[in-house]
Amino acid sequence: MKLLSLETSTEACSAALYLDGEITERYQLAPQQHNKLILPMIQSLLAEADLKLHQLDALAFGRGPGSFTGVRIAAGIVQGLAFGADLPVAPVSTLAAMAQEVFAESDSQYALPCIDARMGEVYWGVYRRGNDGMAKLSGSEVVADAGAV
C-alpha cells in the first residue's frame, strides 16, 4: 500500500509516506508556517520515493481536533490532490493517531491524548486498546477546561 498522510492541526506540521510497510516522514515544529511547509514536504517525500501522486493508493489527513486553520490547510490540500489524481481520502482523528502511537510503543491498555485548544482549554479523549491493537474511542472527543482533565 502507498499512502500519503498530512497533519497540520497542531503547532507541528508533518507529512508521512507509508510505502509497503516503511514510513518516511517530514516533521517541523513551526507554528503558523504550515501553509509554507506542507507542499515542499509532500514534494520531497514523493521525489525521495520516486513516486508520482497518481501512483498512491490513498491520501489521509488529520481531521482534528485542533487549529481550525490548520485542519483546513490539510483538508484543502488533500482534497485538491485527491481530486486531481482520482484518489480516495481518509480523515483521521488527531487524538486517535496520538493514542495509536502510545499503543505502538507501550503495553498500555488506555491512552488519554490531549491537545492545547487555547484559552485554558484542551481537546482530549479516552482511548482503549482494541483486541486488534487499534485505538478505540471510549465516549467522545471533547474540549474542556485544562484543570478538569
Locations of the language-model features?
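Buried hydrophobic packing segments
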Residues: 42, 77-81, 98-102
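Surface "functional belts" at beta-alpha junctions
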Residues: 88-149
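N-terminal beta-alpha supersecondary unit
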Residues: 1-63
